[in-house]
């Protein structure tokens, strides 16, 4: 239970820290951010009392609360209706939270009350990280091996409610899958290989769902290729070897590396690289919250999204170990996050099945 609470709370704490009321999400210079961090007294001194959460946490809560509202053994039609409704409703809470364009525009296009009203058409420009940043809790709700198919379907469909492009919604799959792996204490060095093994299943689901199949398959390879290249670079494509990092991999080098992973020059702003940067930080940080933060929260890329994802996975693995209470005690929406986490724990600890479409 504590790990579930830490997952939801530290995801939001990471988001608030990486966002810094918009100052750090859009400051594309990691060295400047780290200098400002030092001037504020370093990570342990940061009190998030006045640091708002961004769109990432508002939408992650929307996903989580929809999952809780759907209850035990839900019908997928009902779950998708609830997800669409919560995504639409949460748009009223975006003032000062810098929501992504695709998330806002497409959430408002959803018609939750109509049959299939949660579906939007394919769009070749929807590879952003908006689907990935809000999907982690799907892995808290469906963590069991027997629920893998459900995790694939729900993460993809929740993702393509606003990001109907494989680079976008496969990011949601990665976020949810790695959370489930963390719940099951699977060592992080195996996670990447697990994702690669699951991509054919995801593709099969896209074909079976029969919705914009051709367009999705045409744009499929980018996500897969990017991840394969990254796993090869770290030497963990086999899921057995320890990851290798460059000897010199400080703030500046990490900024350059994150930019090199990106689609458009802003590291972590897409569906493939937001979870990738979060994963890179988890691999390097081990049980150190500070090391995780320095790598995933404070950099020149889309820092609140990589932080929200990394904070969730790390929280599942390590709880609140070594985290300064000031980083989360006065966190916005903390009660909601904790309440939702406890409800997800009671649903996720039982191996229920969903009623398919």
Swiss-Prot record:
MF terms (GO), sorted A to Z: ADP-ribosylarginine hydrolase activity; magnesium ion binding; potassium ion binding
Effect ascribed to mutating residue 55 to N: Complete loss of activity
Alphabetical GO biological process terms: protein de-ADP-ribosylation; protein modification process
Catalysis: reaction(s): N(omega)-(ADP-D-ribosyl)-L-arginyl-[protein] + H2O = ADP-D-ribose + L-arginyl-[protein]; alpha-NAD(+) + H2O = ADP-D-ribose + nicotinamide + H(+)
Keywords: Hydrolase, Magnesium, Metal-binding
Annotated consequence of substituting residue 302 to N: Complete loss of activity
Binding site for substrate: 85, 101-103, 124, 130, 163-165, 263-265, 269-270
Annotated Mg(2+) 2 binding sites: 302, 304-305
The keyword Nucleotide-binding is annotated on this UniProt entry: no
Cofactor: Mg(2+)
Gene3D superfamilies attached to this UniProt entry: ADP-ribosylation/Crystallin J1
Record: residues binding Mg(2+) 1: 54-56, 304
GO cellular component, one term: extracellular space
EC number: 3.2.2.19
Superkingdom per UniProt: Eukaryota
Cofactor binding summary note: Binds 2 magnesium ions per subunit.
Family: Belongs to the ADP-ribosylglycohydrolase family.
Protein role: Specifically acts as an arginine mono-ADP-ribosylhydrolase by mediating the removal of mono-ADP-ribose attached to arginine residues on proteins.
Subunit structure, as described in the record: Monomer.
Protein name as it appears in the record: ADP-ribosylhydrolase ARH1
Organism: Homo sapiens (Human)
């Amino acid at each position: 239970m504590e790990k579930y609470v830490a997952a939801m709370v530290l995801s939001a704490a990471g988001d608030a820290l990486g966002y810094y009321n918009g100052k750090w999400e859009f400051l594309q210079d990691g060295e400047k951010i780290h200098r400002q961090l030092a001037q504020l007294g370093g990570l342990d001194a940061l009190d998030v009392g006045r640091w708002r959460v961004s769109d990432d946490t508002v939408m992650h809560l929307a996903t989580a609360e929809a999952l809780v509202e759907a209850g035990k053994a839900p019908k997928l039609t009902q779950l998708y209706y609830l997800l669409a409704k919560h995504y639409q409703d949460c748009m009223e809470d975006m003032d000062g939270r810098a929501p992504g364009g695709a998330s806002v525009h497409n959430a408002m296009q959803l018609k939750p009350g109509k049959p299939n009203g949660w579906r939007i058409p394919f769009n070749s420009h929807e590879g952003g990280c908006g689907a990935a940043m809000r999907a982690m809790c799907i892995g808290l709700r469906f963590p069991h091996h027997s629920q893998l198919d459900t995790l694939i379907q729900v993460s993809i469909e929740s993702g393509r409610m606003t990001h109907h492009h494989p680079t976008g919604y496969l990011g949601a799959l990665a976020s949810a899958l790695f959370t489930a792996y963390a719940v099951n204490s699977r060592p992080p060095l195996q996670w990447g290989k697990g994702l690669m093994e699951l991509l054919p299943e995801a593709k099969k689901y896209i074909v079976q769902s029969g919705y914009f199949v051709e367009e999705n398959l045409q744009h499929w390879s980018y996500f897969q290729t990017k991840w394969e290249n990254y796993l090869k670079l770290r030497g963990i494509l086999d899921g057995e070897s320890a990851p290798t990092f460059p000897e010199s991999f400080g703030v500046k080098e990490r900024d350059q590396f994150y930019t090199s992973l990106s689609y458009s020059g802003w590291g972590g702003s897409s569906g493939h690289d937001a979870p990738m940067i979060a994963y890179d930080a988890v691999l390097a940080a081990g049980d150190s919250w500070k090391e995780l933060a320095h790598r995933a929260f404070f950099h020149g890329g889309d820092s609140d999204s990589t932080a929200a994802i990394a904070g969730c996975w790390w929280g599942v693995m390590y709880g609140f170990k070594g985290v300064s209470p000031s980083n989360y005690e006065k966190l916005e929406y903390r009660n909601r996050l904790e309440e939702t986490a406890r409800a997800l724990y009671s649903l996720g600890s039982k191996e229920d099945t969903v009623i398919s479409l």
